[in-house]
């Protein structure tokens, strides 16, 4: 078993792109922990629309007001990344009941792989509960206005890349 720090949380995701819902979750988690590491996953199987480094940059820009938040890209197994940063908490967002089954399965697998790490679920603020990266991408791809769902830099990146 690795030494973990329960004051360090990892919030993993593809963040393709980072949305106002993600930002809200990090903003509410930041005061609860000494450090929040936003782990931006390479996730080649998901076929991200934005390259990893651009997703990391956009997340850093969106979260720069939080001194205890760092954004790191990774291309390893999540369990290895969590151990690498020494985190004792894995943060996940639950928007709706539809998220629960998948998140419960992932939490169970992570408990098997990294039993020393606890998974903590946070629900979004109501105004962000319907936002997902895939919906934001689809709306942007079809020429819709996503400025209410993501930071301006993300909106510009989507216009350029989709």
Swiss-Prot record:
Q: Which family is this sequence assigned to?
A: Belongs to the bacterial CoaD family.
- Give the catalysed reaction(s), semicolon-separated: (R)-4'-phosphopantetheine + ATP + H(+) = 3'-dephospho-CoA + diphosphate
User: What's the superkingdom here?
Assistant: Bacteria
Keyword Nucleotidyltransferase set for record: yes
Q: Pathway, per Swiss-Prot/TrEMBL? A: Cofactor biosynthesis; coenzyme A biosynthesis; CoA from (R)-pantothenate: step 4/5
GO CC term (a single one):
cytoplasm
> Which EC class is the enzyme in?
transferase
Q: Which residues of this UniProt protein bind substrate?
A: 14, 46, 78, 92
A biological process from GO? coenzyme A biosynthetic process
Compartment(s) of residence = Cytoplasm
**What are its cofactors?**
Mg(2+)
Q: Which SUPFAM superfamilies match?
A: Nucleotidylyl transferase (SSF52374)
Where, by residue number, does ATP bind?
14-15, 22, 93-95, 103, 128-134
Q: What is its EC number?
A: 2.7.7.3
**Role summary:** Reversibly transfers an adenylyl group from ATP to 4'-phosphopantetheine, yielding dephospho-CoA (dPCoA) and pyrophosphate.
Classification via HAMAP family: PPAT_bact (MF_00151)
One GO MF annotation is: pantetheine-phosphate adenylyltransferase activity
- InterPro entries attached to this UniProt entry: Cyt_trans-like, PPAT, Rossmann-like_a/b/a_fold
A Pfam family cross-referenced in the UniProt record is CTP_transf_like
Origin species, per record, is Xylella fastidiosa (strain Temecula1 / ATCC 700964)
The entry's protein name is Phosphopantetheine adenylyltransferase
Q: Where is this site: Transition state stabilizer?
A: 22
Lineage runs:
Bacteria, Pseudomonadati, Pseudomonadota, Gammaproteobacteria, Lysobacterales
């Amino acid at each position: 078993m690795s030494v973990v720090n329960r004051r360090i949380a990892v919030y993993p995701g593809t963040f393709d792109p980072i949305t106002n819902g993600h930002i809200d979750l990090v903003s509410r988690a930041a005061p609860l922990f000494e450090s929040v590491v936003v782990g931006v996953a390479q996730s080649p199987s998901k076929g991200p629309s934005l390259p990893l480094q651009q997703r990391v940059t956009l997340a850093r820009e969106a979260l720069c007001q939080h001194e205890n938040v760092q954004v790191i890209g990774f291309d390893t197994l999540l369990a290895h990344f969590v151990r690498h940063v020494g985190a004792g908490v894995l943060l996940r967002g639950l928007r709706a009941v539809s998220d629960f089954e998948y998140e419960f399965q992932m939490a169970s697998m992570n408990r098997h792989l990294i039993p020393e790490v606890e998974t903590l679920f946070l629900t979004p603020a109501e105004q962000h509960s319907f936002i997902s990266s895939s919906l934001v991408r689809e709306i942007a791809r079809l020429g819709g206005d996503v400025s209410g769902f993501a930071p301006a830099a993300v909106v510009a990146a989507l216009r350029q890349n989709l």
